[in-house]
A protein has these predicted regions:
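FAD-binding core/adjacent interface of flavoenzyme oxidoreductases
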Residues: 1-11, 27, 33, 77-147, ...
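Beta1-alpha1 glycine-rich phosphate/pyrophosphate-binding loop at the start
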Residues: 6-75, 148, 159-185, 200, ...
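Residue-level detector of alpha-helix initiation sites
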Residues: 14-15, 38, 115-117, 156-157, ...
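A Rossmann-like FAD-binding core segment of flavoenzymes
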Residues: 69-98, 103-104, 166-264, 304-313
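Predominantly flavin-linked oxidoreductase catalytic cores and closely associated redox partners
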Residues: 102-105, 112-194, 199
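FAD-site-proximal beta/loop scaffold in flavoenzymes
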Residues: 116, 121, 126-143, 239-286, ...
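Internal hydrophobic alpha-helix adjacent to the cofactor/substrate pocket in enzyme cavities
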Residues: 163, 291-311
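Conserved small/polar residues in nucleotide/adenosyl-binding loops
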Residues: 314-321
Length: 325
């Protein structure tokens, strides 16, 4: 097993990780990045990105991630394949295991492991992810201007995205599996008073219809078992995201949903020298540009933290008491 020590270790790739790498490399922190299971993050499944500055004609998600990686490498980032499988933040220096092939200690660690959208698990949904099925209304809603779409979900996020889509699309149909919402009263009221939003309760999505693009959704009333087809050109899944933080449980403070807690106005965590950027610490905005912004912040925070330490002296760090999330 390889054993190395570095000034800055970045765990995860994507807009947050690559931006952190660009800034850390330019600050001569000589960052090493392990890209994880999905190099590039959720954008690797995105065909068109039209809302990231600098791409006036839009760009495909994988191409954008390739551009970011190239920029990070140009400034000296050591980008490596590999998945972090265990962390030891109570040790000094902090230690990270990369599968069974590397043991990395680092003065600073930037966590940019992102979050994973929850999906329905339908084969037709997977097949049409690039053809009209999306987990981000803000990202992709514009493509369905003046069209009819459906959205699956019952919480605040689903209601918020339905309201957003109602301003763009001619009609939005919400498919709610149970007989009521899980959202706040204010969000429910907003949905129910929007004229072009229709809500179908006790409704399950059986299949996404269409060969190359979404042409409709087969739905079933779970009270009567009656199936019917709903004609739409886009289907938005808004049943939540799961932060990729399993390996950090018991090592760093997480909130009740598993997102890494950061000190407001910074990317600092409760562990000195450990920073978090992107969707792994953001369940509100979840945009490529905001992830990139926090990636920048994390590198600047790491640089300033190192400068404040002077010659690094390693002392024992206390683990958080809330080991279960």
């Amino acid at each position: 097993m390889i054993k190395e020590h570095h000034k800055c270790l970045i765990i995860g790739a994507g807009p947050a990780g690559y931006t952190a790498a660009i800034y850390a490399a330019r600050a001569e922190l000589k960052p090493v990045m392990y890209v994880g299971m999905q190099p590039g993050g959720q954008l690797m499944d995105t065909t068109e990105v039209d809302n990231f500055p600098g791409y006036p004609k839009g760009v495909e998600g994988p191409q954008m991630m390739e551009d970011m990686r190239g920029q990070a490498e140009r400034f000296g980032t050591d980008v490596r394949t590999g998945v972090a499988t265990q962390v030891f933040f109570n040790e000094s220096p902090k230690r990270v295991l990369i599968e069974d092939k590397a043991e990395i200690t680092a003065d600073t660690i930037i966590i940019a492991t992102g979050a994973t959208a929850k999906w329905l698990g339908l084969p037709s949904e997977e097949r049409l992810k690039s053809g009209g099925v999306s987990a981000c209304a803000v990202c992709d809603g514009f493509f369905y201007r003046k069209q009819e779409v459906a959205i699956v979900g019952a919480g605040d996020t689903a209601c918020e995205e339905a309201t957003y889509l109602s301003k763009i699309c001619s009609k939005v149909t919400m498919l709610v599996r149970k007989d009521g919402f899980r959202a706040s009263k204010a969000m429910v009221n907003r949905v129910m008073t929007t004229p072009n939003i229709e809500v179908l309760f006790n409704t399950e999505t059986v299949e996404v219809l269409g060969a190359q693009t979404v042409e409709g959704v087969k739905i079933k009333n779970n009270q009567t078992n009656v199936e019917s087809n709903l004609v739409v050109t886009g289907l938005f899944i808004a049943i939540g995201h799961t932060p990729n933080t399993d390996i950090f449980k018991g090592q760093i403070d997480l909130d009740e949903n598993g997102y890494i807690k950061t000190i407001p106005g910074s990317t600092n965590t409760n562990i000195p020298g450990v920073f978090a950027a992107g969707d792994v610490q953001d369940h509100v905005y979840r945009q490529a540009v905001t992830a990139a912004g926090t990636g920048c912040m994390s590198a600047l925070d790491a640089e300033r933290w190192l400068a404040a330490q002077g010659p690094v002296s390693y002392t024992h760090l206390t683990l958080p008491t809330n080991r279960e999330v």
